[in-house]
Regions:
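Rhodanese-like catalytic fold shared by cysteine-dependent sulfurtransferases
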Residues: 1-16, 23-68, 74-122
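Short, well-ordered beta-to-alpha junction loops that form the rim of enzyme active sites
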Residues: 21, 74, 254-258, 364
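A short acidic, helix-capping loop that chelates divalent metal ions and anchors anionic groups
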Residues: 26-27, 104, 219-225, 326-327
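A structural preference for short, hydrophobic beta-strand core positions in alpha/beta folds
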Residues: 36, 95, 184, 212-214, ...
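Short phosphate-binding/catalytic loops that engage adenosine nucleotides
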Residues: 91-92, 208, 313
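ATP-dependent adenylation/nucleotidyltransferase module used to activate substrates
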Residues: 112-267, 271-275, 279, 302-303, ...
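Catalytic subdomain that performs nucleotidyl-dependent activation
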Residues: 181-182, 259-345
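The feature marks non-catalytic terminal segments
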Residues: 313-389
């Protein structure tokens, strides 16, 4: 292993930094200067054989052989095995101790809370006013998400979406056109100490007063072979409803954004044979008097990423037990489908720049008279039911 401090003492031209995490994790942040490659790509590129390579490739491999290869994963566990395999091939290879999380915590130590928070809040009011703040308030008003007397549990997972949502609610409270309360809730379903510290540090830095409660959800789903991520999400929502109710809240706010909505619409059609959407708000079926709201409903994911990067913020993505020991967590069936849908939309957008807006609007323009069948309150209605009336 090589530590973060030891890495910092090396000159940039003396090593090659390789990020072996999944595409989704890398999308949430990468160590500057790192090259993103899968385990298979790394093993293929650094095969150790120069005989069959062309001149350019051979030269690159010879250059690599003279440099340290430093590999990192999420928390420095699975990268150890890969580093060992590369050492067996003759490379001077190391695993970054603690992985990306270790680097992230080290970066956060050097940031001053007052300065960071002030910049973040200013960016919401100024630079991102149009694309983030105005779309947030539009969703609040258009879908009547916040009402007088509400007590809202803003649910923070530790990612970019929920952290932004928390800051937007703090800004909304400053305007406070009518009285309502917010509580910032973090559920620890079994985070590693390092990941919990990342969440706590970000909350401290952004001056978000969080309520943390613990559960054993990660332990409960760890040995589930089929769709553990789906079961985990369902269980987490139930725990959040319950804790929010204990705090006196009547609503929970989740950080789903515009892109989540349009991807859900297409996934339902292409994989579920149904037309449905992710609603901006809904009543809980299991917790009487509770509602779920999605205030980021109109905000684009690229704008959230731009806000994150502009403020040099670093957040966790998935911090479950699976990412400690498994490289395929992000390839879980449902996640891979969502990635596939993202790619499909991006491909269509090359020819039709309005495709995203059209998908979003499609569920607002459903004509019941032109569908074969539909369901209402669990009852299926067919066009033939009233055809001859």
């Amino acid at each position: 292993d090589i530590t973060i401090n030891e890495l910092g003492q090396l000159t940039p031209d003396s090593y090659i930094l390789l990020d072996m995490r999944g595409d989704v994790e890398v999308g949430h942040g990468i160590i500057p200067g790192a090259i993103h490659m899968s385990k298979e790509e790394i093993l293929e590129k650094y095969s150790g054989g120069l005989v069959k390579a062309d001149e350019a490739e051979a030269a690159e491999r010879e250059d690599s052989a003279e440099k340290k290869l430093i590999i990192y994963c999420a928390r420095g566990r699975i990268s150890q095995e890969l580093a060992e395999a590369l050492r067996d091939r003759g490379y001077d290879a190391y695993s970054l101790k603690g992985g990306y999380t270790s680097w992230l915590l080290n970066e956060m130590k050097n940031q001053q809370a007052d300065e960071v928070c002030a910049q973040v809040e200013k960016s919401i009011r100024k630079k991102f006013r149009k694309n983030i703040w105005c779309k947030f308030t539009k969703a609040i008003n258009q879908y009547e998400l916040v009402k007088e007397g509400d007590c809202i549990a803003v649910c923070i997972s530790g990612g970019k979406d929920s952290m932004l949502m928390a800051k937007l609610f703090q800004e909304l409270k400053l305007h406070n056109k009518f009285p309502f309360e917010v509580k910032f809730v973090v559920m620890d379903p079994g985070y590693s100490p390092e990941n919990r510290k990342v969440i706590e540090e970000n909350a401290r830095k952004l001056k978000i007063p969080i309520h943390i409660f613990e559960s054993d959800i990660f332990e409960s789903v760890y040995h589930i072979e089929k769709s553990p991520c789906y079961l985990c999400a369902r269980m987490r929502r139930g725990y959040l409803y319950n804790f929010a109710k204990e705090l006196g809240c009547n609503k929970i706010a989740l950080g789903h954004h515009y892109d989540d909505v349009i991807e859900t619409i297409l996934m339902g059609m292409l994989y579920g044979a149904q037309i449905q959407t992710m609603m901006p708000k809904l009543h809980s079926t299991n917790f009487e008097g509770m509602e779920l709201i999605r205030p980021l409903y109109l905000i684009r994911e690229d704008d959230i990423k731009a806000w994150r990067d502009y403020n040099d913020l670093r957040f966790i993505q998935c911090a479950c037990k699976f990412t400690d020991t498994c490289t395929t967590c992000n390839n879980e069936e449902n996640q891979s489908k969502r990635v596939e849908i993202k790619q499909l939309i991006a491909e269509i957008k090359k020819k039709n720049p309005y495709v995203e807006a059209h998908i979003f609007k499609s569920v607002e323009n459903v004509n019941i008279e032109t569908v074969i069948a539909y369901k209402k309150d669990g009852v299926k209605h067919h066009f033939l039911d009233n055809y001859d009336l």
